[in-house]
Structure formats: structure tokens, C-alpha cells
A protein has these predicted regions:
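C-terminal "closing" transmembrane helix and its immediate cytosolic amphipathic cap
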Residues: 1-11, 309-361
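Membrane-helix interface linkers and caps
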Residues: 7, 74-91, 95, 114-118, ...
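Functionally critical transmembrane alpha-helices in membrane proteins and complexes, commonly lining
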Residues: 18-78, 96-98, 227, 301-306
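Aromatic-enriched alpha-helical transmembrane segments of multi-pass intramembrane proteins
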Residues: 20-21, 27, 130-271, 304, ...
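Generic alpha-helical transmembrane segments of integral inner-membrane proteins
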Residues: 29, 65, 100, 104-108, ...
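Hydrophobic transmembrane alpha-helices
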Residues: 72-79, 175-183, 232-244, 274-286, ...
Length: 361
């Protein structure tokens, strides 16, 4: 299936923004920080900042940053692709190689080693198959537990980071569906979708007060959280059409975010914080060019860190938040760089060689 001539855009070379690598690494490490409290039994002591009735832990802030930057970069990727098939291939190559390795390693290596049940019972339990299938496909949400794995620990999930990945997939589906209409060619197209998500969130769909889930997210994620993540994603999409980058976007973003905290209005935070994030990301300081050449470990940090932290706690290596973070952060970063170097980047390069005109974000 190809995008019509009205929707297709020229396949130009994208502008290189070196700031996104640092921004996404910061986001991933913020998630590691929050999990360092939750997985050692000190969740109530984790740092929290509040904007009105919106409480924000570093991990949630990191997730917001990931969705904003993803919306910005994936919208640009959509504009450069020749059609839906190419768009799907690009997204598949970015998410599934590392995810597949993680899921199979979790089920067939980590699980049998740390489980408290027999190997036979472990593999016969329907939880094992559910974990493998759900987390490998993502379409119908994720599974969080394996039989006998990490039982009795403050957090019993095998990988509590994966729940956001289906939400990312849903955002891609919405983006492609809207893109096929040609709406994203308009400066107000992404802004319209962003406004819709914010309205769902703002007018009554707060966590715990609305119905549980809609569509594919039924019984998986509370709809208030889904609408919030949709808002962050399409805030990034909307900013593609704003002709401001770097400091020109960063300064108004800082001002709006500051006002949001000062007056306690989450809506201003939804507007200002994405501007701040893209202002940082869409910059090209020379000091970050070296980091860009090394690669982007952020996705690997995000998906590998949680089971790593669980193992560190299980064997008594780190049982309080600060030691956990100081150990898990560099180890997860090393895993992230290794994943990028030997798995994620080769997968993207292989796809580029197959489709020379494609540019993958």
C-alpha cells in the first residue's frame, strides 16, 4: 500500500539533531531512578514533583520525554516513507529486534535460573506462554509475571517497563491512520489530535476515576494514562510543524513549564514541557556529536534495566535505592550500548540496504 501523491513528501535528508541522544538517555536513566526506589521497597520515598493534581515521579517524566521525542521523530519518519508498509517495517526494525532478544532471554534463561518452582512446572504453567506471546506481539498488552520468578520481592514483575510499548504501538497506528488522510500535512493536524487527547485527559479521565481502558487497552492500562501518553506523543507530532528549534523553542518551553508549576495547572505543563524537550533535542551542540557517533543506548537502557535491577535485589547486591541506582545505571547503559551496536543498529542498517531510499528514525 502506498501513500497517495497528496500525502507523500520528498525523501529529503533529515536534519541531524544531536541533542536527542542525550535527552533520551536522560529519560531512560530517570526511569531507572524511580525503579530503584520501587524495586527495593522504598517506593513511597521516591522523589515526586506536583503540578496541581498531577504527581510526577522521575520515571513518569522519563516516559513523557520518550513519548514526546518519539512523536516528533516518528512523524518526520512518516513524512519520508513511501507508504504504510515501509513505515511498519521501520517501526518493526526499531522495536522488535532488541525486544525479541529480551523476551526470549527472560523466558528461557533468566526465568529457569531464578524461579522457585521446578523447571517442568515453570514451562507447563500457562503464565510462561502468556508472557512469551503477549510481550513478543504487544498488540494485546503485556504480561508482567513468570511462575516463581522474583516472588517475595518488593516488585514481583519480571519487566515493569514493557507496559508502555503497546501504548507506543497504538500511537503509531493512530499516526499512520491520520497520516493517510493527509491531515498531518497541515500545520494544525498534529495539534488537533494533541488537543483531543488532552481534552479526554483534562475533563474527567483522571487515574482511578474513569472507565478502565478503551479499544485494545481494555483491562491493560487505565484510559487516563493512555490518553496522557497519547497527548505527550502528539505534542511531539504537533511540534514538527512549529518552525522553532533549539533555544527558540526551549525558552518558551521553560517559561510555560515554570508557570505550570507556579499556578498548579497541568494543562500548561502538557503544553510547555514538550516544547522544552524538543527544544533540547532539536539542537546540535558540538559536544554531543561524539555521543551521536557512539550510538543511542536509551531503548536498551529502558527495556533491560528492570530485570537487571530485579536480579541485583534478588542476590543482595543492591537492596536500597542509592546503591541500586549507582549499580544499575552504568550496567544498563553498557547493555544499552551493546544492544545498539550489535543488534538494533545492524537491524536498521539491514533495512536501509534493502530499501536505499528509506530513512529510519
Amino acid at each position: 500500500m502506498t501513500v497517495s501523491a497528496e500525502i507523500k513528501k520528498p525523501q529529503n535528508t533529515p536534519t541531524r539533531y544531536y541533542g536527542f541522544d542525550a535527552v533520551r538517555i536522560f529519560a531512560a536513566l530517570a526511569v531507572v531512578l524511580t525503579h530503584s526506589f520501587a524495586l527495593t521497597g522504598f517506593e513511597e520515598d521516591r522523589p515526586i514533583i506536583s503540578v496541581g493534581n498531577l504527581n510526577i515521579a522521575p520515571g513518569y517524566l522519563g516516559v513523557c520525554i520518550f513519548f514526546v521525542t518519539s512523536g516528533f521523530l516518528v512523524a518526520q519518519s512518516w513524512g519520508r516513507t513511501s507508504g504504510v508498509r515501509e513505515f511498519v517495517r521501520n517501526r518493526f526494525a526499531r522495536i522488535w529486534p532488541a525486544l525479541t532478544l529480551l523476551i526470549f532471554a527472560s523466558v528461557f534463561i533468566l526465568g529457569p535460573i531464578v524461579t522457585t518452582v521446578s523447571t517442568g512446572e515453570y514451562f507447563r504453567d500457562k503464565m510462561t506462554l502468556e508472557y512469551l506471546v503477549k510481550n513478543s506481539t504487544l498488540i494485546f498488552g503485556t504480561a508482567s509475571k513468570l511462575p516463581g520468578v522474583f516472588v517475595g520481592q518488593p516488585g514481583s514483575s519480571v519487566n515493569g517497563s514493557l507496559w508502555t510499548l503497546p501504548q507506543e504501538i497504538y500511537a503509531y497506528i493512530i499516526l499512520a491512520s491520520v497520516g493517510l488522510t493527509g491531515l498531518l500535512r497541515r500545520w494544525w493536524g498534529g495539534l488537533l489530535i494533541f488537543t483531543g487527547f488532552v481534552c479526554f485527559w483534562r475533563f474527567g479521565f483522571y487515574a482511578g476515576s474513569g472507565p478502565r481502558g478503551i479499544g485494545f487497552s481494555l483491562s491493560i492500562v487505565n484510559v487516563s494514562f493512555s490518553t496522557a501518553l497519547g497527548a505527550w506523543f502528539f505534542a511531539g507530532v504537533a511540534l514538527v510543524k512549529i518552525p522553532l528549534r533549539g533555544i527558540k523553542l526551549f525558552i518558551p518551553g521553560v517559561l510555560l513549564t515554570g508557570v505550570a508549576f507556579a499556578v498548579g495547572e497541568p494543562l500548561l505543563f502538557f503544553i510547555g514541557f514538550p516544547m522544552l524537550v524538543i527544544g533540547c533535542g532539536a539542537s546540535s551542540p558540538k559536544v554531543l556529536r561524539g555521543l551521536h557517533r557512539i550510538g543511542d543506548p536509551s531503548y536498551g537502557i529502558y527495556i533491560y534495566s528492570f530485570p537487571l535491577q530485579q536480579v541485583l535485589f534478588r542476590y543482595g547486591v543492591a537492596t536500597t535505592p542509592v546503591p541500586m541506582f549507582l549499580l544499575a545505571a552504568p550496567l544498563a547503559t553498557l547493555l544499552g550500548f551493546a544492544s545498539w551496536r550489535f543488534l538494533e543498529h545492524p537491524a536498521l542498517i539491514a533495512l536501509k540496504r534493502k530499501k536505499p531510499a528509506a530513512t529510519i528514525s
